[in-house]
C-alpha cells in the first residue's frame, strides 16, 4: 500500500489529478475550521490590514515589489505593529537582504528591554534554528523575523501567538502552511492571530499586482471558513 498525506493541496484540478495518479482517489477527512471547533487547534483570527498608498502604476510585478519592500513608512508600520503585539510573534518575509534584514534591524533597534529578536533565513543552519525554537518555547514575547522558505513549513513552535505576512504572496500552499505555524495549541494558548498586510496602490482603471494577490488570499480564507476582518489604513507619503 502507498499512502500520501497533506494538509495543503494547491487548489488546482491538475494537482489533484497528479496525486491521484500516484496514490489513488483522494479523501478529505477533515477541515482546519472543524479541528478548531473540536479544540484540536487554536482559534484563528485574521486581521487583513490594507495599506492605502497614493495611486501608482507599475509596468511589471518586480517594480511593485521593489517599491513595497523599500517603502520606509511601510516597514516602520510593520516594525511598530510587531513591537506592539503581545505574545511570541513570527514575521515572515520573502527577500533576505532587501527586506528581511531591514525589518530585523528596525525591530531589534527599537525593542525595549531584553526582548529577544531572532533573524532566520536560508543561511542559518538547522542547529541554530532549533536553538531559536527551543528559546521561543520558553519565552512570552519573543520575535522571530524569518523567511517564508525556512519557517513556512516544518517548524513546530506551540508557543507562537502571532504571524505577520510582511511580504505579499499569491501561493495558496505557502500561505496555508504559514498559517499552520501559529495554529498549534500550547500551554495557556487557545487563540492565534494572523496579520495579513496588503497594499492598495490602485488607479481608477487598474488594481495593482499585489492587491490582486490579496484578493486570492481572501478567496482562500473564505474557502477554509476562516474568520477575517479587513481594515484599511491610510499610508501617507
Regions found by a protein language model. Give the residues of each.
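Post-DEXD/H (motif II) to motif III coupling segment of the RecA-like Helicase ATP-binding lobe
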Residues: 1-45, 221
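Conserved RecA-like helicase motor-core motifs
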Residues: 90, 104, 108-130
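Loop/turn-to-beta-strand initiation segments
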Residues: 1-3, 88, 139-143
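A short beta-strand-to-loop transition that corresponds to the Sensor-1 phosphate-sensing loop
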Residues: 5-9, 94-96, 146-149
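Conserved RecA-like P-loop NTPase helicase motor core
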Residues: 122-223
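Short hydrophobic segments within beta-strands
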Residues: 5, 90-94, 120, 166, ...
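Long, largely alpha-helical accessory region at the distal end of helicase-like NTP-driven motors
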Residues: 88-89, 226-237
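Conserved interdomain hinge at the start of the Helicase C-terminal
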Residues: 56-94, 98-109
Amino acid at each position: 500500500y502507498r499512502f500520501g498525506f497533506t494538509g495543503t493541496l494547491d487548489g488546482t484540478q491538475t494537482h489533484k489529478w497528479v496525486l491521484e495518479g500516484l496514490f489513488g482517489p483522494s479523501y478529505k477527512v477533515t477541515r482546519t475550521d472543524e479541528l478548531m471547533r473540536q479544540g484540536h487547534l487554536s482559534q484563528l483570527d485574521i486581521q487583513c490590514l490594507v495599506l492605502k498608498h497614493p495611486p501608482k502604476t507599475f509596468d511589471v510585478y518586480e517594480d511593485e515589489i521593489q517599491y513595497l519592500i523599500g517603502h520606509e513608512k511601510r516597514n516602520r508600520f510593520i516594525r511598530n505593529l510587531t513591537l506592539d503585539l503581545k505574545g511570541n510573534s513570527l514575521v515572515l518575509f520573502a527577500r533576505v537582504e532587501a527586506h528581511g534584514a531591514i525589518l530585523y534591524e528596525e525591530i531589534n533597534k527599537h525593542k525595549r528591554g531584553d526582548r529577544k529578536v531572532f533573524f532566520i533565513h536560508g543561511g542559518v543552519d538547522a542547529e541554530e534554528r532549533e536553538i531559536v525554537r527551543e528559546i521561543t518555547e520558553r519565552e512570552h514575547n519573543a520575535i522571530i523575523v524569518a523567511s517564508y522558505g525556512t519557517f513556512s513549513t516544518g517548524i513546530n513552535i506551540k508557543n507562537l501567538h502571532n504571524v505577520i505576512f510582511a511580504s505579499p504572496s499569491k501561493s495558496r500552499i505557502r500561505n496555508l502552511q504559514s498559517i499552520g505555524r501559529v495554529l498549534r495549541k500550547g500551554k495557556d494558548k487557545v487563540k492565534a492571530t494572523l496579520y495579513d498586510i496588503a497594499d492598495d496602490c490602485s488607479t481608477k482603471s487598474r488594481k495593482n499586482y499585489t492587491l490582486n494577490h490579496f484578493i486570492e488570499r481572501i478567496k482562500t480564507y473564505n474557502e477554509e471558513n476562516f474568520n477575517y476582518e479587513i481594515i484599511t489604513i491610510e499610508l501617507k507619503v
